[in-house]
A protein has these predicted regions:
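Short, hydrophobic-biased segments on the C-terminal half of alpha helices
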Residues: 44-48
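Alpha-helical DNA-recognition elements
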Residues: 33, 49
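Short alpha-helical segments that sit at the start of domains
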Residues: 1-13
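Glycine-centered, phosphate/nucleic-acid-interacting loop/turn motifs that mediate DNA/RNA or nucleotide
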Residues: 54
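Short capping segments at the starts of secondary-structure elements
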Residues: 17-23
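Non-DNA-binding regulatory cores of transcription-related proteins
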Residues: 57-58, 62, 66-141
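A short acidic, leucine-rich amphipathic alpha-helix
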Residues: 26-32, 43
Length: 141
């Protein structure tokens, strides 16, 4: 049964317009900007329904809760920022024949997750270390 409510439309729009996989909490916060009464229970229920209807896909990262993205992206991979934990899409294609596998094995599918720092985190000014005064010179210098 497909429900076409304001909440459902808001959740689907948030995921579709994000340009990257979103966590449940990110979907809730962005959805509440459109529908202030949106609850976490409604988000979970709608994510389950949208996944069952093949409108969205869960992005599974080892040891983490699923994130969600639309199904129309085609072949792509993911990049996870080690500083802010956001996940980004990388569009491109790797030939199945170039994926290493043991002899006499056949690769049927694969996931690729790259880890590093996103441009926002690279460009953030570093905060001084706690208890460190950058203007105080050491007598040992």
């Amino acid at each position: 049964m497909e429900r076409n409510t304001r909440q459902r439309n808001a959740i689907l729009a948030v995921i579709s317009e994000a340009g990257r996989p979103l966590s449940t909490q990110e979907i809730l916060v962005k959805g509440q900007a459109v529908v202030p009464s949106l609850s976490i229970a409604t988000v979970y229920r709608t994510l389950k329904d949208l996944t069952a209807e093949d409108c969205i896909l869960p992005v599974k990262l080892p040891g983490e809760a699923d994130r969600y993205e639309i199904t129309t992206l085609g072949d792509h991979y993911h990049f996870k920022c080690s500083s802010c934990s956001k996940v980004f899409d990388i569009h491109g294609r790797i030939k199945r024949s170039s994926v290493p596998a043991p002899a006499d094995f056949v690769v049927e599918r694969y996931d690729l997750i790259l880890y590093g720092r996103c441009s926002d985190c690279i460009n953030k000014p570093q905060s001084p270390q706690r208890g460190h005064d950058p203007f105080k010179r050491s007598i040992l210098e």
